[in-house]
Amino acid sequence: MAIVSSSAGRADSQPPAAKSRVVDASPLPEEASPAREDGLRPRRLEDYIGQRELKQVLAIAVKAAMGRGDALDHVLLYGPPGLGKTTMAMVLAEELGVKCRVTSAPALERPRDIVGLLVNLQPREVLFIDEIHRLTRVAEELLYPAMEDRRLDLTVGKGSTARTRALELPPFTLVGATTRAGALSSPLRDRFGLIQRLEFYGLEDLQAIVERAAGLLRLQLTAQACQEIARRCRGTPRIANRLLRRVRDVASVCGGESLIDAALVDEALTLHRVDARGLDASDRRLLDLLLESHGGGPVGLETLAAALGEDPATLEAVVEPFLLQLGFLQRTPRGRVVTGAGRRHLGWPELP
């Protein structure tokens, strides 16, 4: 399976970027290319750890499509960042024995960008579009007949001499990935034959992912060390692999021993200010501010953002979700409140 990547981008209405965080599930610049992951990505469904129900559904769909000699139905994968949507698209292409052409919606700014991709597709190839919810209206309208009728409608000429020309396309599979399925237009969403959500990973699967990645990186970790990384990675394989690389760095410089144990993992991740539950400095700053200056809340988002020197959209989209997921923070009509669990984690007494 070959990967063909298109990475040109454009500005778009996204939440402002937060400062670089080792526990941020969004890809760092060095992780942006699918081909640059130290070979940690699985290549086949049998190597893909976790997401059991998703794998079962897709394995049946792939086998059926290959039996018919036809392209796989179009697939929409959605869920939080870092759970393996891009990896799954590449795995599907590998299972089908075809190329995976990789791009993202911001790279498809002009009509000719999407037209160029579509006309160069070979039969049954996979076209992967990341952040598909950010497609322009023009790009979406070009995709409608391509997905449904395997046809590209092109307008030739201008004004009164303009004519529409239909160009036949080979059978292909569009795999779209998004963290915001609700932001897709209904006409686009309805053209996907398979719509599947990726879930956060459990501790057992994450430990298996760390063990596999350690083997590929030629690192020796104890079972307890793998478990320690798995506990701190926020249920996200991308973060697990990133934390493993940071542990590798510390081990190669300070470790001395060839076997990495839980104590060394704790030392390395404490250096990066990632605690036993996966909270980093940004998470703790928010909770500490609420507790120390406001008695645990409630406090409005704008007030918190001003006190922390952060953009409100960044706090809401980047920092708060994991705290809400852990049950350390609540959003109420009057503002943000630290929960009893959040107080206990930071060593504060619970309210009477």
Swiss-Prot record:
- The record lists DNA as bound by 331, 336
Q: Which reaction does it catalyse?
A: ATP + H2O = ADP + phosphate + H(+)
Instruction: Name the source's superkingdom.
Output: Bacteria
Q: Do the record's keywords include ATP-binding?
A: yes
What InterPro entries is this protein classified in? AAA+_ATPase, AAA_lid_4, DNA_helicase_Holl-junc_RuvB, P-loop_NTPase, RuvB-like_N, RuvB_C, WH-like_DNA-bd_sf, WH_DNA-bd_sf
Give the CC-aspect GO terms.
cytoplasm; Holliday junction resolvase complex
**Which SMART domains does the entry mention?**
AAA (SM00382)
**Per UniProt, where does Mg(2+) bind?**
86
Cysteine pairings via disulfide bonds: none
What name does this protein carry? Holliday junction branch migration complex subunit RuvB
- Organism of origin: Prochlorococcus marinus (strain MIT 9313)
Show the taxonomic lineage: Bacteria, Bacillati, Cyanobacteriota, Cyanophyceae, Synechococcales
